[in-house]
UniProtKB/Swiss-Prot annotation:
Coiled coil: none annotated. The keyword Nucleotide-binding applies. This is Sulfate adenylyltransferase subunit 2. The lineage of its organism: Bacteria, Pseudomonadati, Pseudomonadota, Alphaproteobacteria, Rhodospirillales. Belongs to the PAPS reductase family. CysD subfamily. Pathway: Sulfur metabolism; hydrogen sulfide biosynthesis; sulfite from sulfate: step 1/3. One of its GO terms (molecular function) is sulfate adenylyltransferase (ATP) activity. With CysN forms the ATP sulfurylase (ATPS) that catalyzes the adenylation of sulfate producing adenosine 5'-phosphosulfate (APS) and diphosphate, the first enzymatic step in sulfur assimilation pathway. APS synthesis involves the formation of a high-energy phosphoric-sulfuric acid anhydride bond driven by GTP hydrolysis by CysN coupled to ATP hydrolysis by CysD. Its EC number is 2.7.7.4. GO terms for biological process: hydrogen sulfide biosynthetic process; sulfate assimilation. SUPFAM superfamilies: Adenine nucleotide alpha hydrolases-like (SSF52402). It comes from Rhodospirillum rubrum (strain ATCC 11170 / ATH 1.1.1 / DSM 467 / LMG 4362 / NCIMB 8255 / S1). Keywords: ATP-binding, Nucleotide-binding, Nucleotidyltransferase, Transferase. Heterodimer composed of CysD, the smaller subunit, and CysN.
C-alpha cells in the first residue's frame, strides 16, 4: 500500500498549504465517498486539533435520505463546523428535477454554491473532485483559479511545478483546491478499507425499490418521485458508485455488499463511475460548461 501512503502525504500537504495560504478556506462536503476521505484526511492533517475551516454542504432538498442522516451523524461524531446552504428562492419557486430539467442543476447547485461562497467570503474552496472522474476534471489544476464570478477558465490557470501552489487571489477571486486530484476511484476504496472510514450505506448493495427510466435505475427514495405510465417499482439488488440528488442518480445492479467486494468489482469495471449521473449526459462537454459557470 505504499502508493496510498504517497497519496495520503500529498493530500495532507495540500490541505495544510490551503490552511496556510488562504484567509478564509472552506471544505465542500457533499457526503459521498470522496468527501468522507477528505474529512478523514483533514482530521489527520491537523490532529490533534480539529480542521481550522468549516465544512459546507449545498443541500438541494433532493438528496437521498440516507445521505442526510449520514451527514448529521458524522458531523456530530467529528465535531466539525458544518454550514448547510440551500437556494431558498429556488425552493420557493418550486424548482425540482422533474419540472426544470437541466436548469435545476444550475439553480439548486451552481447558483446555490456561488451564493454560499459569496456570502461566506471564502477564498480557498476545498473539494473532492478527482482527475480520473471526468475529462474536464482531468485537465484541472490542484489549485484551480476562479474569477470574481466563481467562473473557471481552463486557459487562465497557473503552472504547478514541483508541487508548488500559488494561492494568491484578488478581491472577490477564489481558488478551488482539489487534494484528491491524483487519486483514482480504486485508490479511494482501498484507502477507505485500510483506514476503516465510514461511508453512506447506499454504496453497498442490497435489495432496493427502483424504476428503470431512460436506461437508468432510479431508486424510489420517497413519494415525490412521479411514476410514469406503466412504471412499477421493482425490488432489485443495486448499489451506487456515485451519489447526488436521487432522481438524477442511477444505481448499478450489484451484489457487492462489503468493501472487499466493491474493490473486486472495481478491478474489472470498464465504465466511469459518473455513468450514473444524469446531469453529465444532457449535452456534449456538459461538465466543462457547468464548471465554467461555477459548478463544483
Amino acid at each position: 500500500m505504499k502508493h496510498l501512503d504517497s497519496l495520503e502525504a500529498e493530500s495532507i500537504h495540500i490541505l495544510r498549504e490551503t490552511a496556510a495560504q488562504f484567509r478564509k478556506p472552506v471544505l465542500m462536503y457533499s457526503i459521498g465517498k470522496d468527501s468522507s476521505v477528505l474529512l478523514h484526511l483533514a482530521r489527520k492533517a491537523f490532529y490533534p486539533s480539529r480542521p481550522p475551516f468549516p465544512f459546507l454542504h449545498i443541500d438541494t432538498t433532493w438528496k437521498f435520505h440516507e445521505m442526510i442522516a449520514f451527514r448529521d451523524k458524522r458531523v456530530a461524531e467529528e465535531g466539525v463546523d458544518l454550514i448547510v446552504h440551500t437556494n431558498r428562492a429556488g425552493v420557493e419557486a418550486g424548482v425540482s428535477p422533474f419540472t426544470h430539467g437541466a436548469a435545476y442543476t444550475d439553480i439548486m447547485k451552481t447558483q446555490a454554491l456561488r451564493e454560499a461562497l459569496t456570502q461566506g467570503g471564502f477564498d480557498g474552496v476545498i473539494g473532492g473532485a478527482r482527475r480520473d472522474e471526468e475529462k474536464s476534471r482531468a485537465k484541472e489544476r490542484v489549485f484551480s483559479f476562479r474569477d470574481a464570478h466563481h467562473r473557471w477558465d481552463p486557459k487562465n490557470q497557473r503552472p504547478e511545478l514541483w508541487n508548488t501552489y500559488n494561492g494568491r487571489v484578488g478581491k472577490g477571486e477564489s481558488v478551488r483546491v482539489f487534494p484528491l486530484s491524483n487519486w483514482t476511484e480504486l485508490d479511494i476504496w482501498l484507502y477507505i478499507l485500510r483506514e476503516s472510514i465510514p461511508v453512506v450505506p447506499l454504496y453497498l448493495a442490497k435489495p432496493r425499490p427502483v424504476v428503470e427510466r431512460d436506461g437508468a435505475l432510479i431508486m424510489v427514495d420517497d413519494n415525490r418521485l412521479p411514476l410514469e405510465p406503466g412504471e412499477t417499482p421493482q425490488t432489485r439488488w443495486v448499489r451506487f458508485r456515485t451519489l447526488g440528488c436521487y432522481p438524477l442518480t442511477g444505481a448499478i445492479e450489484s451484489r457487492a455488499a462489503s468493501l472487499p467486494e466493491i474493490i473486486a468489482e472495481m478491478l474489472v469495471a470498464r465504465t466511469s463511475e459518473r455513468q450514473g449521473r444524469l446531469i453529465d449526459q444532457d449535452q456534449a462537454a456538459s461538465m466543462e460548461m457547468k464548471k465554467q459557470e461555477g459548478y463544483f
